[in-house]
Amino acid sequence: MSPKTETKASVGFKAGVKDYRLTYYTPEYQTKDTDILAAFRVTPQPGVPPEEAGAAVAAESSTGTWTTVWTDGLTSLDRYKGRCYDIEPVPGEENQFIAYVAYPLDLFEEGSVTNMFTSIVGNVFGFKALRALRLEDLRVPPAYSKTFQGPPHGIQVERDKLNKYGRPLLGCTIKPKLGLSAKNYGRAVYECLRGGLDFTKDDENVNSQPFMRWRDRFCFCAEAIYKAQAETGEIKGHYLNATAGTCEEMIKRAVFARELGVPIVMHDYLTGGFTANTSLAHYCRDNGLLLHIHRAMHAVIDRQRNHGMHFRVLAKALRMSGGDHIHAGTVVGKLEGERDVTLGFVDLLRDDFIERDRSRGIYFTQDWVSMPGVLPVASGGIHVWHMPALTEIFGDDSVLQFGGGTLGHPWGNAPGAVANRVALEACVQARNEGRDLAREGNEVIREASKWSPELAAACEVWKEIKFEFEAMDVL
């Protein structure tokens, strides 16, 4: 080729590598109401300036790549690129920053949590220029959230279906989590529901194993539900875990649950995946089933303070993908959950409009418009002595779930359920009378145990049980 010959590459295109901040760090940018906003905790490698690190996150999670490419000229990068528009240091940390990134809405497929996460928490988390990266929060604009169905039914519809108002709902995970036959499993379900619980639950590990195939479990649990309903006059439910190896099998199990006439099914939304979860949520709305969500695997993603994704983001994603309940920690039990942080994402699950509040870890104001809310489920290492704190912390719109705290009662499953129901009713009554559960909770339980031998026995068994470990994820 003659030296004088001009090519496309030599006109308006300069090959090579340039700093991300030249294109993707735009502190002058005014965010739009339609932008998806993200707050990342960024720990750069030594020698990488904060602006370059923040810009790299914006680039690698949107339109950028490691080198300049001539096909940039075939589109409008200004329209589609992510922008790092602000950076602030993390107090008390030497080389850590919060980078705020704005993404134009056109980058994301409507109604797809899967596509949204593929971009925002995709390959950028393995980027070598960063020692660690954590997505702390996400602002989902109404223009995007309205493309999602959200929860199949929501809090008010669930209460109307169950005809239960003015108190938290009570549940129990059947134990041992693995190894029971379907008939013995159904027996435990019946005893707990007859004793006063609203729900019992499949453990997240229970799918369709050799010792208990899913169809047998579904049938025996349905029998237990109907028998308990007939004896108590209350509507009962059992979270039948429909999680399976394929979406087709999952839907088949949900169809069978609907044919049995039970009110609720369950899904492990992180191990099952967002695409499967959204499909199941759509089926549940169309067919009148409530959907309980377990968060198995969440701690792999959210427990480390410097890397991964905070659970408040996973909670928002679940509200969009669809679920009527989700496990949300207990604050007082055996599982991770600091109070202010937990209440922050509990509000993000339940409320329509949540103001920015950094004291609770909420980086952005979130407007869900008319999307139904999700009931937070407190579960894991809780018992009757925790009831006042749980009632005070979570309020009425919650599910309090006692597995070992029901089935571990010295007199059996039904007395364990009675003890929990009595404790809950006593706490709700005391609260409604104006008593301070935070200060008087133990006294409320002691008073109730004087006329409930089941509660008295439970109080004696668990009087010394505490889980006093420092939370890993704090503000």
UniProtKB/Swiss-Prot annotation:
<comment type="similarity">
    <text>Belongs to the RuBisCO large chain family. Type I subfamily.</text>
</comment>
<dbReference type="GO" id="GO:0016984">
    <property type="term" value="F:ribulose-bisphosphate carboxylase activity"/>
</dbReference>
<comment type="subunit">
    <text>Heterohexadecamer of 8 large chains and 8 small chains; disulfide-linked. The disulfide link is formed within the large subunit homodimers.</text>
</comment>
<feature type="site" description="Transition state stabilizer">
    <location>
        <position position="334"/>
    </location>
</feature>
<keyword id="KW-0479">Metal-binding</keyword>
<keyword id="KW-0456">Lyase</keyword>
<dbReference type="InterPro" id="IPR020888">
    <property type="entry name" value="RuBisCO_lsuI"/>
</dbReference>
<dbReference type="GO" id="GO:0019253">
    <property type="term" value="P:reductive pentose-phosphate cycle"/>
</dbReference>
<dbReference type="GO" id="GO:0009853">
    <property type="term" value="P:photorespiration"/>
</dbReference>
<dbReference type="GO" id="GO:0004497">
    <property type="term" value="F:monooxygenase activity"/>
</dbReference>
<feature type="binding site">
    <location>
        <position position="177"/>
    </location>
    <ligand>
        <name>substrate</name>
    </ligand>
</feature>
<feature type="binding site">
    <location>
        <position position="295"/>
    </location>
    <ligand>
        <name>substrate</name>
    </ligand>
</feature>
<protein>
    <recommendedName>
        <fullName>Ribulose bisphosphate carboxylase large chain</fullName>
        <ecNumber>4.1.1.39</ecNumber>
    </recommendedName>
</protein>
<comment type="function">
    <text>RuBisCO catalyzes two reactions: the carboxylation of D-ribulose 1,5-bisphosphate, the primary event in carbon dioxide fixation, as well as the oxidative fragmentation of the pentose substrate in the photorespiration process. Both reactions occur simultaneously and in competition at the same active site.</text>
</comment>
<feature type="binding site">
    <location>
        <position position="204"/>
    </location>
    <ligand>
        <name>Mg(2+)</name>
    </ligand>
</feature>
<keyword id="KW-0120">Carbon dioxide fixation</keyword>
<keyword id="KW-0503">Monooxygenase</keyword>
<feature type="modified residue" description="N6,N6,N6-trimethyllysine">
    <location>
        <position position="14"/>
    </location>
</feature>
<dbReference type="InterPro" id="IPR036376">
    <property type="entry name" value="RuBisCO_lsu_C_sf"/>
</dbReference>
<feature type="binding site" description="in homodimeric partner">
    <location>
        <position position="123"/>
    </location>
    <ligand>
        <name>substrate</name>
    </ligand>
</feature>
<keyword id="KW-0150">Chloroplast</keyword>
<dbReference type="InterPro" id="IPR017443">
    <property type="entry name" value="RuBisCO_lsu_fd_N"/>
</dbReference>
<dbReference type="GO" id="GO:0009507">
    <property type="term" value="C:chloroplast"/>
</dbReference>
<feature type="binding site">
    <location>
        <position position="203"/>
    </location>
    <ligand>
        <name>Mg(2+)</name>
    </ligand>
</feature>
<keyword id="KW-0460">Magnesium</keyword>
<keyword id="KW-0488">Methylation</keyword>
<keyword id="KW-0113">Calvin cycle</keyword>
<dbReference type="Pfam" id="PF02788">
    <property type="entry name" value="RuBisCO_large_N"/>
</dbReference>
<dbReference type="InterPro" id="IPR033966">
    <property type="entry name" value="RuBisCO"/>
</dbReference>
<feature type="binding site">
    <location>
        <position position="379"/>
    </location>
    <ligand>
        <name>substrate</name>
    </ligand>
</feature>
<keyword id="KW-0934">Plastid</keyword>
<dbReference type="InterPro" id="IPR020878">
    <property type="entry name" value="RuBisCo_large_chain_AS"/>
</dbReference>
<feature type="modified residue" description="N6-carboxylysine">
    <location>
        <position position="201"/>
    </location>
</feature>
<feature type="binding site" description="via carbamate group">
    <location>
        <position position="201"/>
    </location>
    <ligand>
        <name>Mg(2+)</name>
    </ligand>
</feature>
<feature type="modified residue" description="N-acetylproline">
    <location>
        <position position="3"/>
    </location>
</feature>
<keyword id="KW-0560">Oxidoreductase</keyword>
<feature type="active site" description="Proton acceptor">
    <location>
        <position position="294"/>
    </location>
</feature>
<keyword id="KW-0007">Acetylation</keyword>
<feature type="propeptide">
    <location>
        <begin position="1"/>
        <end position="2"/>
    </location>
</feature>
<feature type="active site" description="Proton acceptor">
    <location>
        <position position="175"/>
    </location>
</feature>
<feature type="binding site">
    <location>
        <position position="327"/>
    </location>
    <ligand>
        <name>substrate</name>
    </ligand>
</feature>
<dbReference type="InterPro" id="IPR000685">
    <property type="entry name" value="RuBisCO_lsu_C"/>
</dbReference>
